[in-house]
Amino acid sequence: MIQERADIEKAYASNLRKFAARLEMFLRTGVEYGTATNILSGLAKEAEDNAELHSNIAAGLINPVQLGIKNWQRENFHKSSISTSIKEVKNFDSEFENAQKTWYKHYKNVNRCKKEYFHACKTVRSLQVQVQNAKNEPFGTPEQQAQRGKELRKMEDKLRKGIMEEEKTRKAYEEAISSLSDVTPRYIEDMTQVFNKAQAFERERIVYFKEQALQMQAVLDISAKPNLSQIFVELRETVAKVDADADLKKWSLAYGVDMAPNFPVFQEYSPEMSALGKKGRSALADGSSGGVTLTSLKTFTSPDRGGPIPGTTDSGSNISTSPVHTTDYTSSVNGAAAAVSKEKQRVEDTPPYPDFVDDGRPGVPIRALYDYVGVEADELSFNSGDLFEKLEDEDEQGWCKGRKDGRVGLYPRQLR
């Protein structure tokens, strides 16, 4: 019974943890954003905390409640080595049997004498009726009268013997009752002694199980748990932090009318720029090509044209621009590690590309077979063994679209 209740608590805790895990997984998809994520994270934490609470209840039912009962049973109920019966029960049966052994012998004798006496009485009553009927029959021929006379004498003789047997059995029955009465006080005394002993043993059992039931009640009384109210206080405080206006403003700054403008500006053609486009991504990902990677390009500004818009970034070609003099055209060539470091920092400060906004569609779970560090803002970074989702198959340049930790971006199908 206790084990069954503990299993119920364990199953409830397990279901709460599964529910919390699904909420956490939904949070990682990035569908919800801003302070509204507090709702899901708060519910997930409440489920985890309640799961822990009910896991502790299940553990408390097993130890000390169930374990204590099992130990008490081992100490007070011992199984026989030759049978499945309990030794204590068998001992009580033997003591009761010994206490009533003498009395029971007299009791059986009383029942036997009673049966014989009742049978003798029944026989006498039957013979009396037969004799009376024989005397009342009409007279017939002399021969018939002589025959009935003989039969009547036989019945009267049987009746006399029956009456004598009735007296004999009556006397035996009375003596048996008297003998039984003589041993009855001792029988009552012995039976009372054994019965009181059994009652004391049973009282000990009931008192112990009452104590264990009260302990079980204390374990199950969830209202008395000090951290129960705190769980829901924290949930309420977490949900209260949701700010719709702040979330809408943040979304507008990132994707709406309040976002920083990023309009195209004139850029002078350079052959190296082709390595930064989507057509040249395979070369950018190849660290063994022996070439160099163009990581920064400052715009050449004609004397008769104004400078580019300060702080703008061309997301299509991954080129940062800033107002410089005409002769200030330079290209910075660094090692792969330095380029990765600079690009990772720039990714954190650059709004996501419109083509890579998470629309919430389901993806195909995949596991990375290699390490890759995204060079551009629209690329994903991952380590070998990481799990993420594939959203689109490989394009003609060998790039796939995927989602990792709620962020959508590109990754190479394989390193070349």
From Swiss-Prot:
Region (Disordered): 297-327
SUPFAM superfamilies registered for this protein in UniProt: BAR/IMD domain-like (SSF103657), SH3-domain (SSF50044)
Signal peptide, first to last residue: none
Biased amino acid composition, Polar residues: 312-327
A Gene Ontology molecular function term of the record: phospholipid binding
Start and end residues of each SH3 domain: 361-416
F-BAR domain sequence ranges: 1-247
Pfam families for the chain: SH3_1
Keywords: Coiled coil, SH3 domain
SMART domains according to UniProt: SH3
GO CC, alphabetical: endosome; plasma membrane
PROSITE patterns: F_BAR, SH3
Record-level GO BP terms: cytoskeleton organization; plasma membrane tubulation; regulation of endocytosis
Protein name: Antigen EG13
Biological source species: Echinococcus granulosus (Hydatid tapeworm)
UniProt gene name: EG13
